Amino acid sequence: KKQCGVLEGLKVKSEWGRAYGSGHDREAFSQAIWRATFAQVPESRSLFKRVHGDDTSHPAFIAHAERVLGGLDIAISTLDQPATLKEELDHLQVQHEGRKIPDNYFDAFKTAILHVVAAQLGRCYDREAWDACIDHIEDGIKGHH
């Protein structure tokens, strides 16, 4: 299995910059990721009661979804800076600790990211690099790094 090395990190960082876009695009992008996640694991919505996870168009959920992608954005943009990335992943791990998020929810989120990014980028997309680097980020959030 491919590792998330410097080259993979730089590729993902560059492709993420193109896929993530800006402004209103980001809202649609984050909603697409969460809808794809909930389609795979509908029961995961219960983790988001406080932010109206039953309605991905609710302003509270949109704000939450964008905060999550903001964290992912920081993680991806520091893939080529291991010390900074570790700090960010440690911070995200603390935020997720105690929530007992099953691994299959992380898997569904990763699948959603890969799907939405691929749809956004078409052929200019290195699936193996994304696969390795999203695993690396999620392992850090789960505390397996």
UniProtKB/Swiss-Prot annotation:
Coiled coil: none annotated. It holds the Pfam family Globin. InterPro entries: Erythrocruorin, Globin, Globin-like_sf, Globin/Proto, Haemoglobin_extracell, Mb-like_M. Keywords: Disulfide bond, Heme, Iron, Metal-binding, Oxygen transport, Transport. Heme b binds at H96. One of its GO terms (molecular function) is iron ion binding. Residues 3-145 form the Globin domain. Disulfide bonds join C4-C133. Signal peptide: none annotated. PROSITE patterns: GLOBIN (PS01033). GO terms for cellular component: extracellular region; hemoglobin complex. Belongs to the globin family. The extracellular hemoglobin of the earthworm consists of 12 subunits that have a hexagonal bilayer structure with a molecular weight near 3.8 million. Each one-twelfth subunit is composed primarily of disulfide linked trimers (chains A, B, and C) and monomers (chain D). This is Extracellular globin-2. It comes from Lumbricus terrestris (Common earthworm).
